[in-house]
């Protein structure tokens, strides 16, 4: 069974490039401090890596 990751948006996307905004939205994060739980897949890990400076990630 794949691990679950708890992803929280901790920094604002205001002033960030459009590709970073799109990545945050693709993760399902809309507002500051919103949290989603996703399975650990290569695609999700790549998105997390791209915007890691905006997120906090924990194992769920």
Swiss-Prot record:
A biological process (GO) of this protein is: translation
> What's in the keyword line of the UniProt record?
Ribonucleoprotein, Ribosomal protein
As one GO molecular function, the record gives:
structural constituent of ribosome
List the CDD domains.
Answer: Ribosomal_L30
Q: Give a yes or no for keyword Ribosomal protein in this entry.
A: yes
SUPFAM superfamilies attached to this UniProt entry? Ribosomal protein L30p/L7e
**Which Pfam families does this one have?**
Ribosomal_L30
Question: Gene Ontology terms, cellular component aspect?
Answer: cytosolic large ribosomal subunit
Family named by the database record: Belongs to the universal ribosomal protein uL30 family.
What does the subunit section of this Swiss-Prot or TrEMBL entry state?
Part of the 50S ribosomal subunit.
**Record NCBIfam families:** rpmD_bact (TIGR01308)
Which protein are we looking at?
Large ribosomal subunit protein uL30
Protein's gene: rpmD
């Amino acid at each position: 069974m794949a691990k679950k990751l708890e992803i929280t948006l901790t920094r604002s996307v205001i002033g960030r490039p459009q590709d970073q905004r799109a990545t945050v939205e693709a993760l399902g994060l809309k507002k500051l401090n919103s949290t989603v739980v996703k399975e650990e897949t290569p695609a999700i890990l790549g998105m997390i890596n791209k915007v890691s400076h905006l997120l906090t990630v924990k194992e769920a």
